[in-house]
Amino acid sequence: MEKVSYYTEEGLQRLKGELTQLKSEGRAKVAEQLSEARDKGDLSENAEYDAAKEAQEILERRIAKLEELMINARVINKDNINTSAVSILSKVKIKNKKLGKVSTYTMVSEEEADLKEGKISIESPIGKGLLGKKAGEVAIVEAPAGKIEFEILDISF
């Protein structure tokens, strides 16, 4: 059994929507591509058929992954979150001690992470380093380029 994953209501609904779309529209599109490729004759030398089969495999793997996530997904109740330390759904303002750069991130599940929206995964190196820390503390994060120190300036929800 996979581990339980926690999501915001919005994030879980987005994943459910993706699953529904893939099962209906995605499968229909791939079935149409397979049918068109079959109509072109000999399947042993049919690149379109091979491409459609590969697309089908990728689609089915994503559907299976989303279905597994749904089984183990839980919506986060904000009332049960410790607001004194960094946790999932925390909005964290941090300062890179070496560069002096200040950034704000929201801590989310791996599937909801989107750096462009300022959402980082609690499973990422930075996320793991920040979890459980309090405002004023320094988190040391192991990154490919070496250790990075982040000072936690503020935590909000």
From Swiss-Prot:
Keywords: Coiled coil, DNA-binding, Transcription, Transcription regulation
Region spans: Disordered: 25-47
Presence of the UniProt keyword Hydrolase in the record: no
Top-level taxon: Bacteria
One Pfam family in the UniProt entry: GreA_GreB_N
One Gene Ontology term of the molecular function aspect: DNA binding
Compositionally biased tracts (Basic and acidic residues): 25-43
GO biological process, one term: regulation of DNA-templated transcription elongation
Coiled-coil residue windows: 43-79
NCBIfam families: greA, PRK00226.1-4
Function: Necessary for efficient RNA polymerase transcription elongation past template-encoded arresting sites. The arresting sites in DNA have the property of trapping a certain fraction of elongating RNA polymerases that pass through, resulting in locked ternary complexes. Cleavage of the nascent transcript by cleavage factors such as GreA or GreB allows the resumption of elongation from the new 3'terminus. GreA releases sequences of 2 to 3 nucleotides.
Family, similarity comment: Belongs to the GreA/GreB family.
Protein's UniProt name: Transcription elongation factor GreA
